Design a protein with these regions (language model features):
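N-terminal charged segments
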Residues: 1-100, 120-137
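Conserved catalytic-core motifs of GNAT/GCN5-like acyltransferases
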Residues: 99-108, 214-231
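Conserved beta-hairpin
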Residues: 135-150
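Conserved acetyl-CoA-binding loop-helix of GNAT-fold acetyltransferases
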Residues: 162, 172-186, 206-210
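Conserved active-site alpha-helix within GNAT-family acetyltransferase domains
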Residues: 177, 199-217, 260, 264
């Protein structure tokens, strides 16, 4: 498990990014001024773009000046540039990584006591859902319910993340909401719990909102390709400070399988 303490530089970067996420979980956001904050990756595995209200955070080990140039070259609304298809395509080509989806990001405060839903923890690390989760998270724990699965683990910058999966035969019975609610009871240490949903997966979005998860923004993760994807966590070892790219904000406008799962 990554503690963010391998090098002083990596730890400092991770702490700043983690603090930004903690603030967002409490409803405190960076200035909505159209600017972009560029940070080094918190570890070799995690890279991507986090878009908040009129502010974006790009976490990559690529040259911040290159990021600035490519954002300025995007022919779109400047506020949309960090998550635009042209810019993400440039990031993928530059890093050799893959963006699977632009996810809707939500967060919820922890709840006291055990969950009401009956759950059985899966200890088998070779379980397919455990293997998948380990490609994106540390400290992974997985529980099974009748017709569904709940995953908890530490994801980007050490934040606790939940993911759920509901069998087709168990849909429309409130199980997704119950699993998402259970995550709020099971998250350790009184920390907020985050969840990513594909925007087109309306069932997942509704389930997490019904469980008390609040919208925060959108996120595109740059995932390593092939067997290197579940890379071990370590400090990125980069000690340069964050860069901010100011983009002009536009003037406000007047007046398959038969199941669903969260991302990843």
């Amino acid at each position: 498990m990554d503690t963010g303490t391998e090098t002083a530089g990596g730890a400092a970067v991770r702490s700043r990014f983690a603090a930004l996420l903690d603030d967002a979980a409490r409803g405190v956001f960076p200035p909505a001024d159209g600017s972009v904050t560029v940070l080094p990756q918190p570890n070799p595995r995690d890279a991507g773009v986090l878009a908040l209200t009129a502010h974006a955070v790009i976490f990559t080990d690529e040259d911040p000046e290159w990021v600035r140039e490519r954002l300025a070259a995007v022919e779109s609304d400047p506020l949309a540039a960090p998550l635009s298809a042209p810019f993400l395509a440039e990031l993928m080509a530059r890093t050799g990584r893959l963006v699977n989806n632009v996810d809707f990001i939500t967060v919820a405060a922890p709840l006291p006591g055990p969950p009401e839903l009956a759950l059985t923890e899966i200890a088998d690390r070779d379980h397919p859902r455990v293997r998948r989760a380990l490609a994106y998270r540390d400290a992974v724990r997985v529980w099974a319910a009748d017709g569904g699965v709940l995953v908890l683990g530490r994801g980007v910058a050490g934040r606790w993340e939940a993911a759920v999966e509901v069998d087709g035969t168990a849909r429309r019975k409130g199980l997704g909401r119950a699993l998402a609610t259970a995550a709020r009871h099971l998250v350790p240490g009184g920390a907020p719990v985050w969840a990513q949903q594909a925007p087109g997966n309306a069932a997942s979005v509704r389930a997490f909102q019904a469980a008390g998860f609040r919208p925060v923004g959108a996120e595109a993760l740059l995932v390593a390709r092939g067997p290197a994807a579940p890379a071990a966590r370590a400090s990125a070892g980069r000690e340069s400070g964050p860069a901010r790219v100011s983009l002009p904000a536009p003037a406000p406008a007047a007046g398959s399988r038969n199941e669903w799962r969260t991302s990843p």
